[in-house]
UniProtKB/Swiss-Prot annotation:
Highest rank taxon of the organism: Bacteria
PTMs per UniProt: Phosphorylated on a serine residue.
Gene Ontology MF term list: anti-sigma factor antagonist activity
Modified residues annotated as Phosphoserine in this record: S55
Protein name from the UniProt record: Putative anti-sigma factor antagonist TM1081 homolog
PROSITE patterns in UniProt: STAS
Cross-referenced Pfam families: STAS
Protein keywords: Phosphoprotein
InterPro entries listed in its UniProt record: Anti-sigma_ant, STAS_dom, STAS_dom_sf
Function per UniProt: In the phosphorylated form it could act as an anti-anti-sigma factor that counteracts an anti-sigma factor and thus releases a sigma factor from inhibition.
Domain STAS: 1-110
Family to which this protein belongs: Belongs to the anti-sigma-factor antagonist family.
Amino acid sequence: MFPYKIVEDVVILMPNKELNIENAHLFKKWVFDEFLNKGYNKILLVLSDVESIDSFSLGVIVNILKSVSSVGGFFALVSPNERVERVLSITNLDRIVKIYDTISEALEEVQGR
């Protein structure tokens, strides 16, 4: 569905192009079916290749965050580009979700838990 890799027990999601109303529902279903419902509770969402993101997708991110948090897991965003970072800031999502500059920085944090 979407590019990803698993490092130890951490799922690293790497969508590209756009996260929007056209694919956000599919993305959410895929994340739940393939990872959350199978017991993975450490998720990194890499946004470096995401060119744009809309409010529907932000809702999906919040939904994933809540689900991961409810089971004591870890969820973070990694390396959003300037445009996406601006959207995260305007919506104050950057105050709710941890954001890391690099995958290695985020992995270091999550694996140290």
